Every structure is written in structure tokens, then in C-alpha cells.
Amino acid sequence: MSRPDAPRWEALARAAAVLLLPALAAQSGCARSTPVAGDRPIEVLVSSDPETLDPRHVTDAVGMRATRLVHAGLVRLDADTLEPRPYAARGWRWLDGSTLEVSLRDDVRFHSGAPFGARDVVATLRAFASPAVGSRHAGVVDAIASAEAEDERTVVIRLSRPHATLLTDLELPILRADQAAAPPAPDGSLDGLGPYAVVHSGGGEVLLTPAEGSVLPRPRHAVVLRTVHDENARALRLEAGRADVAVNLISPTLLPALLAQPGLSSTRRPGANLTYMIVQESHGPLGDARVRAALSLALDRAMICSTLLGGRAEPAGGLMAPAHWAHADGPPLPHDAARARRELQDAGAEGMRVALLTSTERLRGDVARVLAQELAEVGVRADVITLEIGTMIARLNAGDFDLAILQLPEMTEPNVLRYFLHSNAIPPRGANRGRVRDARLDALLDEGDRVMDITARRAVYARLEALEREEMHVLPLWYEDQVSVTSDRARVFSPSAEGRWLALASIP
């Protein structure tokens, strides 16, 4: 099977957008029935329901972003630089190399009206570490030896070992002391400090109301997160004035037709998140680094970025995006189908058959089918399987796959790679779903966690990137821009570099 050249793919992409033009034209021929701004919440479209609204257990992208509207940590990450800034904390100071003193704000209360103080911080950190709670984020606090309340407004945190990312880790949502170790609350009923409180969740929507006394000034508008699986339905909802915000949910092929309609605009910024292909290394030939490297050689990243992704992505040369402080300069990952075919033959893997998992998003399915065709050209038969996100995550955690296309969520700190690649993070302890077991990689991940000097850490991650170019435990694909489509009333909205939605609270 021969792969269509790039011009043909561009033509097919344009044709796909044309399918929706008559519907949009019909809509634009009618008066837009946009409700008055104060009459309805700001509607944010999402492609899937959050798996849970409990910040102790959430791991999916929609759930992570939703819970960060409801809950707040001691710090938050700067929307542009991703550096830690005071949030529920007033400030902090290092007493020595392993002891951090955090002072708390006195103008913040929980949604219920309960006061916020040091005992809540201490209880939260202990709960996230507790095996009885079973938080998926327990690793974030595993370097904390103790947390003690010096007084109602001061917490002293002591580390058990050098740990470079403590301040970033304190972005962890703070819960009320009497709820921190409570049973799971997937409905979002845990008391929070964020700018919104959950009113209702279920039936494809999460309704959030502005909160008084939170870490931010009270937002002007309520927010509803609306699950709409089909891209055409999303576009029509935006055009009709029913929805206000869609982040990374309108494909490049459809975007120009949608933006031609009145009352809609788009913003774009470089993203910090990596789209990659995960490899199940315990499955036969996929455990061979030569095979994984050959699979990488088969993939024409630049062609997909320029066509299917509409130029709104940059081919990946490694795990960290170019704007990231830990990015290591290096040549782009090559595309060489002939060499890939030879290396597969040398490894005895020519003709192997694999299952390639992806989400039900139309664009993701299109991308997966192009990647499968490129793999077919080098002698690998990839059967594309599209799944709802919950089903897909369950299969990944169980190891029931060969290849899968994923996005590393919120690549704010390279230490997050420990959760996805360290041998101690194989599910259910973490998200090392490829079952990577590499002592050299573990050592570099551990070193990056404990080295405090930023220049020394950058050197550690440069060595890690060099190792990954040899081993290809994951196959980096590209870094996608954060692209938002907004209504006139939400035109000031822009997501942060890692894709969070806190700017919703600033919509006038």
C-alpha cells in the first residue's frame, strides 16, 4: 500500500472541512440566538466526561483541568513560564537545604465558609501520602518526611532527601482537614479553595458556580463544562452561540470554515505538552530497542504536522518542547522508511502485527490511520483501535495494547517523567504503561529529582534525552499548539502553556 503524498493529504483535509460548510452556512443565514451574557454560564466544550472530580485520584486531562478550577494549592504555575507563584500561600523561605517554611494567606476560605489554615495543609499532605487513601499522586509527596503546623498560618515542611521540585509539587490541591482522607468523591463534593464550586456533575455536564472568598477574586460568570463527542456538533454549537470556549477541539481542517462565521475568534500559543507513541515493551519484539528505533524511523512527523495538524504543531526532537528550560538541543528525529525496513529485518521483526490504540476523536483517528499506513510501508501491520478515553486508559493500565497515541499532560516539570517512565511507576503505582524497566533511565530520573542546581539538572535531562534517542522507550511525535476558539463574550480567554483553564475566572 503506497502512502498518499502531502499534497493529496492536504486536498483530503480541505474536502473534510467542506462537508460541514453547508450546515454552517445555513446556521449563519439565521439570526444568531446568542443568550445575553448574564443569562447563562460560560460554556466550555470538552470531548469526554472527567473520570472523577476528586483531585486525589484524577489523572485524565479533562478531570485535571476541571479540578484545578475547584481546588487550589499553595502555589500555582505561571501561565507563561510555568514557574511556581504563591497561591493559597502568601510566601515561603528555605530554612536550610531540606526545610521549607510556608506562610499562608489569611484572606482565603473554603467554599463552605470553613476557615483555611495550617492544619488543612498538613492533613492534605499526609492524605496524599497515605496508602489507605490510595492517591494516584502519592509519588508527588514521597520526598516529604514531615509537615508540621507551627501556628495557624505557618507550615514547616521537611524533606527526607534532596528534592528539586518541592515548590512545583506544592501545586497539589489543598483539602479541608476533616475531608482530606475521606472516601473517594468523584462527584466533586470535596470542599475547595479554587474560584469555582461544583453545583452539579453528570449527564454530560459539570456546572460550576463562582465561589466567594477563594484564592482569586470572585469570577463574574458561572461555567459549565459540556461534553460533546462529535466535532461537527461542537462546531455547530459554537456557531449557534451556545458554546463559548473550545480548546484543542476543532481540527485544523475545520477551523477556517468555523472562523469565517461571525462572532467567533481563535487564539494560538506554543504548547508545553508532548504527543507521543507509547510502546508495550513486554510484548515480544517491542522489547527490542532496535525495533522501537525502526518504528520511529518509519514515522513522517513533519508531513503530519504540516497537513493533518495544519501547521499547528512542531515535530518533536525529544521529550521536552523547545521553550522548556530542560530542552536539549539536538537534530530532529529522522524519517527514513528504507532504513526502518532494514533494521526491522535485521531484528527479525519484519511482518509483525500490532494493535494501535487511539481515542475516538476524529482527528486522532485520522492521525492514527496515517501512522498505521506509514508502519505498513516498512512491513508492520498496525490495526487501529479507537476507544473512549476511559476504556482506553483501562486497557493501557492493564498492559492490553502494543502501541498507543497519547499526550503527556501538563509537562510543567521534567520530574513528571518519573511518573510515566520509572520502573517503580508501573500501574497501579503510576503511569508507566509501557512497562519500561531500564536501570540507566531510573538512575537519571532519580538524579534529576534530587539535584537542586538548575544548570546541573539541565545536564541530567540532556543525558536522559540522549539515552532516550537510543532506547526509544517512548516515540516522541510532536508538540501541539494550544488553539482556542472563543465566542465574543469569552474572547479574552487563553489557556496556559500546559493547557489549563484558570483564565475563565478573568472573563469580564
Residue ranges and their predicted role:
Residues 45-96, 126, 191-192:
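N-terminal lobe/hinge region of extracytoplasmic solute-binding protein
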Residues 287-373, 463:
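Append "and occasionally in soluble cytosolic enzymes with long acidic Gly/Pro-rich linkers
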